[in-house]
Amino acid sequence: LVFTKSAHTRAALQGIAHLIGPDTHFLSLQNGIGHANVLREMVPLERIAVGVTTWPARVMSPGEVSSMGQGGIRFMPCDGQRSAVFDLLAEDLNRAGMHCSIDPQVQEAIWEKLAFNAAFNGVCAVTRQTVDGLANPQGEALLQRVLDEVLSVAHAHGVAASAERVGAAVRDALDHHRGHQPSMLQDLLAG
């Protein structure tokens, strides 16, 4: 499982290169896009899956992550083919209560989360506001402009990301995640 920030993926893989063998498979649940390109430097595409998780988490200290609330995991092997290894991984994650599914439409979810994160992470970091600081007409208009831009790029790449689903997620965050500091704001405030 790969959870590192995008900028640290290559270094993390280089740090474990001696452990990567002919049976190694990777599931990237990193935010953003393009992670399979870096993972392909270590293993063939058929041993890579990408996905998205909606489990809320926060790094408490080095090596300690806290998760609160509920979420799920959706992923799909990059070659578009189901495999015994990834099927077993999904089963194991479900047994652990992680609500996991293998989903051929996962690119839609990845781009929708990218749009959501681009809006909240970027705007909250630049304005140094928590999520509820954007719950006003000007903040919501700015969020919408970012969402529209990211979704237009998704659509240009042939991904049918849904403005309605992202809009509902944004509304839910504005209504229920008051005081939340998106990760980019956390990083900025941590120095």
Identify the function of each model-found stretch.
Residues 18-19, 41-47, 62-116, 121, ...:
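Internal alpha-helical scaffold of NAD(P)-dependent oxidoreductase catalytic cores
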Residues 9, 13, 35-36, 86, ...:
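A general structural signal for well-ordered alpha-helical segments in protein cores
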Residues 27, 51-52, 86, 171-174:
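Intrinsically disordered, low-complexity segments enriched in polar/charged residues with Gly/Pro
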Residues 1-64:
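Rossmann-like NAD(P)(H) cofactor-binding subdomain of soluble oxidoreductases
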Residues 155-191:
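C-terminal active-site/capping subdomain that shapes the small-molecule cofactor and substrate pocket
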